[in-house]
Amino acid sequence: MEKSVNVIGAGLAGSEAAWQLVKRGVKVDLYEMRPVKQTPAHHTDKFAELVCTNSLRANGLTNAVGVIKEEMRLLDSIIIESADKASVPAGGALAVDRHEFSGYITDKVKNHPLVTIHTEEVTSIPEGPTIIATGPLTSPALAEEIKRLTGEEYLYFYDAAAPIIEKDSIDMDKVYLKSRYDKGEAAYLNCPMSEEEFNTFYEALVTAETAALKEFEKEVFFEGCMPIEVMAKRGIKTMLFGPLKPVGLEDPKTGKRPYAVLQLRQDDAAGTLYNMVGFQTHLKWGEQKRVFGLIPGLENAEIVRYGVMHRNTFINSPTVLEPTYQLKTRNDLFFAGQMTGVEGYVESAASGLAAGINAANFVQDKEPIVFPPESAIGSLANYITSASKKSFQPMNVNFGLFPELPTKIRAKQERNEKLAERALDAIKKVAEQL
């Protein structure tokens, strides 16, 4: 019997997954509800439609998103092939003519002899090998099915994330390691503020510019996840009883309690990334860098993932997903794209590439491929399946996710070049196995 896989959703992840499957001789039933049923964000019936920006971000190898794109080129990604063909001048970034970009992908996928297109809404998960790549605006009926399959508490409908910072960029002379009331091991880095420093920070925060909500996000309610700037506007002392509460966090250098304390919590197993506890925010990214840079210790902080609050649909991947993008409780069911907790166009496509390769291996009775964590594709899969289950939030690819180099290199550009070189070597070895 001929092997086939259902792919639900023809966005960036679904289109890439379908392409990787047909490249390996696997038949694909590709389901896309547009244009029969539109989402609030899409405008066309094309596959891999770019709904926000036309930029696929940095292209150079001193940036992690440039590395993941190069890895995808080595693995014959249709998304990157199309982006390269449809590129428009954008300095060091890869930006595209969005109509040419999605048109090229639509034509290649639709016209492939192994692809059958189904223009209909999927409301229940099919039997047999399937990849779910329905994106952040998954239809309510399918979301209910996913909830039933993964467990009600493991499906989320919005993203409320605090900024994540590279540990190497924190001024360790100004912060101290301590847990509140010294309970358990000292697990947090603490940024102490004097009253004057707090007041300066407060004024900057309440007057900072926030990002505009998109029309389709306006119904989102963030219970228990109030943006820090909204909390601050309720009164100058509100944060002192919330995320900046200094009680039980005396500075071991002085023995005194600071006026306010921001806690940073380790975000990855390697201890290279820290998140700002309780600082989910809707500030514009430039404002986040400026305002949070007023906090002692964070003056030169490298924010690898800015705080966001927006409509999203994603599963708790650390709980329910394998690094191969297979569901732990049903190994013929794969997830790909933003649904898995990867953030961004390129990252979504990369997860589709990995899921597509592994779904092909599954139906052809081959061993699944766990992409090496030294690679950008592997570092992302490793992060979303091993991050904290309790506080899991979507993540962009960044060098903070990569394992550290055996020899410490202080110069950032040189360090990034070495990480990129190691990543591409790792992917070349994977490509040889395929």
Swiss-Prot record:
PROSITE patterns linked to this entry: GIDA_2
Residues where FAD binds: 9-14
GO biological process, alphabetically ordered: tRNA methylation; tRNA wobble uridine modification
Localisation per UniProt entry: Cytoplasm
Claim: Metal-binding is one of the keywords in the record: no
Transmembrane segments: none
A Pfam family of this chain: GIDA
EC number: 2.1.1.74
Annotated keywords: Cytoplasm, FAD, Flavoprotein, Methyltransferase, NAD, NADP, Transferase, tRNA processing
GO MF term list: flavin adenine dinucleotide binding; tRNA (uracil(54)-C5)-methyltransferase activity, 5,10-methylenetetrahydrofolate-dependent
HAMAP family assigned to the protein according to its UniProt record, in alphabetical order: TrmFO
Function statement: Catalyzes the folate-dependent formation of 5-methyl-uridine at position 54 (M-5-U54) in all tRNAs.
NCBIfam families assigned to the protein according to its UniProt record, in alphabetical order: gid_trmFO, PRK05335.1
Alphabetical list of PANTHER family matching this protein: GLUCOSE INHIBITED DIVISION PROTEIN A, METHYLENETETRAHYDROFOLATE--TRNA-(URACIL-5-)-METHYLTRANSFERASE TRMFO
Family to which the UniProt record says this protein belongs: Belongs to the MnmG family. TrmFO subfamily.
Name of the protein described by the UniProt record: Methylenetetrahydrofolate--tRNA-(uracil-5-)-methyltransferase TrmFO
Record organism: Listeria innocua serovar 6a (strain ATCC BAA-680 / CLIP 11262)
